[in-house]
């Protein structure tokens, strides 16, 4: 079944290239997320500029565009190595979307969706790690960074044959969060609650 893998890689990249943040903002009449808030076309920034409804729509779509190509390839018996490349292709599409001038998001939700087909137990642990980190720290970026660092160890525990491809995916996410890591180190990163509070104050004026 690995013969179909190259085609699945292309399909995954094209799926990832559909920027739901930009499309949802256009449909909802919201500012372009690439030019507003943090400038990142992802669910967290849409939450800041458009509220919960728009952000949830973006989050679900971003998860699905990582999940569906990998799940399809997994069902067809594609080997773990190729599954890893398919997952990375979906994230690359999200980060550098061919349909939107190669300016995309950071790939966290798409990566989460790509990992989900490995198992619901792993999915639950990953989601719990991200949520707990965000609740304790207030930093969405830190939640993504911690989850990416721990993901290979979780996968090794649940299904070790997928450790290498998930490690590749984690490296991509960490590289994409390079600027966030620097801001966290310098204590210059803004907490998500602070930005939401500012938005509410602005809306009430």
Curated annotation (Swiss-Prot):
Belongs to the PlsY family. InterPro entries: G3P_acylTferase_PlsY. It is a multi-pass membrane protein. Disulfide bonds: none annotated. This is Glycerol-3-phosphate acyltransferase. Its main location: membrane. Its EC number is 2.3.1.15, 2.3.1.n5.
């Amino acid at each position: 079944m690995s013969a179909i893998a190259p085609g699945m890689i292309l399909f995954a990249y094209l799926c990832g290239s559909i920027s739901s943040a930009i499309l949802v903002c256009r449909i909802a009449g919201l500012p372009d997320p690439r030019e507003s808030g943090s400038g990142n076309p992802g669910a967290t920034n849409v939450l800041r500029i458009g509220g919960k409804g728009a952000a949830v729509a973006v989050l679900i779509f971003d998860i699905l565009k990582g999940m569906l190509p990998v799940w399809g390839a997994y069902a067809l018996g594609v080997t773990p190595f190729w599954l890893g490349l398919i997952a990375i292709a979906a994230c690359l599409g999200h980060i550098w979307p061919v349909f939107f001038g190669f300016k995309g998001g950071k790939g966290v939700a798409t990566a989460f969706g790509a990992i989900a087909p490995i198992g619901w137990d792993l999915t639950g642990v990953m989601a719990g790690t991200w949520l707990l980190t965000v609740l304790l720290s207030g930093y969405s970026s830190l939640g993504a960074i911690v989850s990416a660092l721990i993901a290979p160890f979780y996968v090794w525990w649940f299904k070790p044959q997928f450790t290498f491809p998930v490690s590749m995916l984690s490296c991509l996410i960490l590289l994409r969060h390079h600027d966030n890591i620097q801001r966290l180190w310098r204590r210059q990163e803004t907490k998500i609650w602070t930005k939401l509070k500012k938005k509410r104050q602005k809306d009430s004026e």
